[in-house]
Design a protein with these regions (language model features):
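Alpha-helix capping and helix-loop boundary segments enriched in small/acidic/polar residues
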Residues: 5, 129, 160-165, 202-206, ...
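N-terminal small/polar loop signature for handling phosphorylated ligands or for N-terminal nucleophile
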Residues: 2-60, 140-198
């Protein structure tokens, strides 16, 4: 879950319902959305659920559900779940399940550090954590990699998630990059599944530009064997043309 006031209540209600139905729950506490996908596979769970409204204001909330493979449920599976609520009478469980805490942040931080191919010593980064889940993970990971970190908006009071900060409001991050002479800056949203970056000049680097940077880097390193990048329906034609100019196809 993220840091919203309502997230604890919804998460506890969800856990109670699962346990009452005979299921067992591992409660990860406040974690980025990607961490839940990671732990679903690591723990061999049947499902994972994130309580968050992502980049929306703090008064909103919702659920994101992952399957056993760590991927979001398909539309077909979501429709099937909805039909279950409408069509089936639920039998009483044979036994009540348990809810216990998931030993988490350290292992997830270890995983993220292991993904970095080179240390970040001598680099300075501004991290805007949107007063959300990234605040407990991102600064720690960057510092472990040797970087100097300027951390913004890491409060966890539950009432200021995404409030004039984070990925939808990168202005303070960009200003901090210029003021501190940082090499780059990164803005997350409340559940850390959205990212906006800035370069050393404070210029915004959005998702399309990040996709192009990653794809061209992997191609140059010989790690893009099919010369294919995957975007979304929102990926703009400018990004597609840039990729095509380097012999990379875009699949939406």
């Amino acid at each position: 879950r993220d840091t919203r006031v309502s997230s604890d209540m919804l998460a506890l209600s969800l856990a109670a319902g699962v346990a009452a139905g005979g299921g067992n729950v591992l409660d990860g506490g406040v974690l980025p959305t990607a961490a839940v996908a990671f732990f679903v596979r690591r723990a061999g769970a049947d499902f994972g659920v994130v309580v968050s409204a992502s980049h929306n204001p703090p008064e909103f909330n919702g659920l994101k559900v992952f399957g056993a493979d760590g991927c979001k449920l398909s539309e077909k599976m979501e429709e099937r779940a909805e039909r279950c609520f409408d069509e089936y009478a639920f039998a009483p469980p044979l036994a009540c399940g348990r809810c216990r805490p998931l030993a988490k942040r350290g292992k997830y931080a270890d995983f993220l550090v292991s993904c970095c191919e080179r240390p970040l010593s001598g680099k300075k980064f501004v991290l805007d954590c949107a007063n959300g889940a990234a605040g407990r993970i991102a600064p720690r990971v960057f510092r472990r990699l040797g970087a100097e970190v300027v951390a913004l908006h890491c409060a966890a009071d539950g009432r200021t998630v995404n409030d004039k900060c984070g990925a939808l409001h990168p202005e303070s991050m960009r200003a901090a990059v210029l003021a501190t002479g940082a090499d780059a800056g990164f803005c997350y949203d409340g559940d850390a599944d959205r990212l906006i970056a800035a370069d050393e000049r404070g210029e915004t680097v959005d998702g399309d530009k990040i996709l192009c940077i990653f794809a061209k880097h992997l191609q140059a390193a010989g790690r893009l064997p099919q010369n294919l990048a995957v975007g979304t329906s929102h990926t703009n034609t400018g990004a597609e043309r840039e990729l095509n100019a380097h012999g990379i196809r875009l699949f939406r």
